[in-house]
Amino acid sequence: MKYNPQAIEEKWQHIWEEKEMFRSEHGSDKPKYYVLEMFPYPSGNIHMGHVRNYSIGDVVARFKRMQGFNVLHPMGWDAFGLPAENAAIKHDTHPAKWTYSNIDNMRSQLKRLGYSYDWRRELATCDAEYYRWEQLFFLKFMEKGLIYRKKAPQNWCPKCNTVLANEQVIDGLCWRCDSVVEQRDLAQWFLRITSYAEELLADLEKLTGGWPDRVLTMQHNWIGKSVGAEIEFAVDGSDETVKVFTTRPDTVFGSTFMSIAPEHPLVEKLITGTGQEETVRAFVTRIRNMDRIERTADTLEKEGVFTGAYCINPLSGRRMPIYVANFVLAEYGTGAVMAVPAHDERDFEFARKYDLPMEVVIQPEGAELTPATMETAYTGQGTMVGSGQFSGLPNEEGKTKIAEWLEANGKGKRTVNYRLRDWNISRQRYWGAPIPVVYCEKCGIVPEKAENLPVRLPLDIKTRSDGRSPLGETPEFYECRCPACGEKARRETDTMDTFVESSWYFARYTSAGDNEAPFDAQALKYWLPVDQYIGGVEHAILHLLYARFFIKALRDCGYMDLDEPFANLLTQGMVLMDGAKMSKSKGNVVDPTEMISRYGADTVRLFCLFAAPPERDFDWSDSGIEGASRFVNRVWRLVEDLPAGMAPMAPCSSSSDDCTGAAAKDIRQKEHATVKKAGADIQNRFQFNTAISAVMELVNALYLTRDELGADEKGRRVLGSAVSSVLAMLAPITPHLCEELWEQLGHKDMLTARPWPRYDEDALLRDEVVIPVSVNGKLRSKMTVPAGTGKEELEKLALAEANVVRHTEGLTVRKVIVIPGKMVNVVAS
């Protein structure tokens, strides 16, 4: 019978679904294992990146089931967001209709690939029964003081007409549409992620070994902890003070001017009445609209403008001019910098440009620096000079002493600063979860009552082509009653950042379908944390950091007793075409549906898993998918062409008594060795490619010995056992093929429900081994010897080999290198 993948795959997908083979329940006596791939945005069609990601997860899920684990492997849809809204505008339809149609199509595509999902747990974040709980979390976070509203400079995408978090601005461009991001002052809702900065940083240690070092480093750097001091500088002739954060309080006596960010709240007060108003305002407007990455680049030309105001150095008493500078950022530290040009490179460059004074206050050992001769700032260690009572101290000691003085004299304090900023979750778009607050003239900002949730997104709306949200123009939505006083009020028309939905979906999977609470306490405790999370490294900062924060916040609200959501993380590589990322605009997209129709799902899965280790990128190639197809057909023919009347054998079930000849001994040893290697490669390193390669070698050996082994009953037992092991090992990778062939072998049970084969250590031992013999590093002979032959005997046998004798004739043997069981190398000259 010819291999017909479409018919076979449809058959077994139906059987698995009918028998609920992948249903999971908490409370089993088996150990639990929760494997999860990052859920997709329902764009309409899956791509090869999806196939690779989900195939990796499916192999892990199926393998763990075979190992005896109670496996949770769910799937859902990250369904809110700007792309759906923009697509709906483009196609003149509603985002909900567009989204749910795409979900239906993508679900069908995923089912065609035979992934072992528990589809009963499917969720879509745009479903009100999902985001009602998110709105409840919002209210709980408000009670905890973890959510607040403030007016602040925000990243604004003029094309998307919405605010972006700092993490969503890539090289000064919107992460979704690549438009140049502008700065606007807007009132927004923020999650106080900075309250967890220290815990987020410290708990990275718990993830060491389970997460890639690269991701841990990225999060460590993004959180960006700095230890230093906050110092207050009084504004001359005013009651105002400017606070600065510095990691170098030892250099405060060398501060000769102040630099503040264009966004600093004191700018207007400082310039009023100085005659500098127009100059400063023009500079501020220009710099605020600059690319944020450009403003932080080392190559940025330092620019500034004098405000006309001065401040007083609290230690030296120096009257220092205050400049607005392009390299100072409002979101880092306090938005103000005490400039120490002799000991900071940016300040040095700025001071030279604007002819500002320098004071050397740290002298290196064995040298004497002077401002006139310095060509660059000195940022190293040394002895403090020109620093009043602190002169003569090593500068590291001076840091502590000056910080103590500042605290004692009410001029500052020791403090820790973080690069991490609070998370802006307000979005001025329609297709998102409504923020559950109202604005009342009498009561102010009032949270919606929990019993009134969900605040539903109105579906009877018309999206706007200009990108503006229709919620602010839908009275049926925004007109409401104040939950506190009952008077007329206005509902918030911003929606939540879609990263909020993806920050807790993995927890909801444990209790999907529970309409009484966001989580079933027992199910949550049983399943979390996720044992293996799989997704792209591009989510290292955004999604993964937000999810870590969200779990800690939910913990502190009493929802769970958990510190970290994902015990282990695998960041898979991309699928490329000719070295470039696949994209429709480049015309280099490979359609998975077309490949499945041509080759079958198992072949597509096999190629994606065999092409490269999972963490590395790989190039799609027609020859590669053809090679995978040949191997699948080769396995099919191996079983199809077995001798008639063979009884079904369990994997690794033949005995040493069945091995009456060399071929049987060799196949039995190879079978057990392959089971050991493939299991270890999948279990320990997710090296599916090497596991598949090992099975391929066993299949090749079976083709060479099939006729010989099929000649007698004992040989057929060895053959049947090895073939069954091949199918069991390939079952997580090519499940439909293996299930069909398993049935053809006469087995009454389903391969999906069987355990992973168990190898026998004794079966791994060989009676004889083949030893390669080299002369001066070149292979000259191979000899078959009893296993365990010692060094002296191997040397003697090697030197007696005819081809070795011929290649050492007339030479003197200088050395014989022997590795028992492995190789012999004769060194002669």
Swiss-Prot record:
Gene3D superfamilies: 3.10.20.590, HUPs, Isoleucyl-tRNA Synthetase, Domain 1. Belongs to the class-I aminoacyl-tRNA synthetase family. It comes from Oleidesulfovibrio alaskensis (strain ATCC BAA-1058 / DSM 17464 / G20) (Desulfovibrio alaskensis). ATP binds at residue 584. Coiled coil: none annotated. It is found in: Cytoplasm. This is Leucine--tRNA ligase. It catalyses: tRNA(Leu) + L-leucine + ATP = L-leucyl-tRNA(Leu) + AMP + diphosphate. The lineage of its organism: Bacteria, Pseudomonadati, Thermodesulfobacteriota, Desulfovibrionia, Desulfovibrionales. GO terms for biological process: leucyl-tRNA aminoacylation. One of its GO terms (molecular function) is leucine-tRNA ligase activity. PANTHER family: LEUCINE--TRNA LIGASE, MITOCHONDRIAL, LEUCYL-TRNA SYNTHETASE. It comes from the Bacteria. InterPro entries: aa-tRNA-synth_I_CS, aa-tRNA-synth_Ia, Leu-tRNA-ligase, Leu_tRNA-synth_edit, M/V/L/I-tRNA-synth_anticd-bd, Methionyl/Leucyl_tRNA_Synth, Rossmann-like_a/b/a_fold, tRNAsynth_Ia_anticodon-bd. A motif ('KMSKS' region) lies at residues 581-585. It holds the Pfam family Anticodon_1. Keywords: Aminoacyl-tRNA synthetase, ATP-binding, Cytoplasm, Ligase, Nucleotide-binding, Protein biosynthesis. The keyword Cytoplasm applies. Its EC number is 6.1.1.4. One of its GO terms (cellular component) is cytosol. A motif ('HIGH' region) lies at residues 40-50.
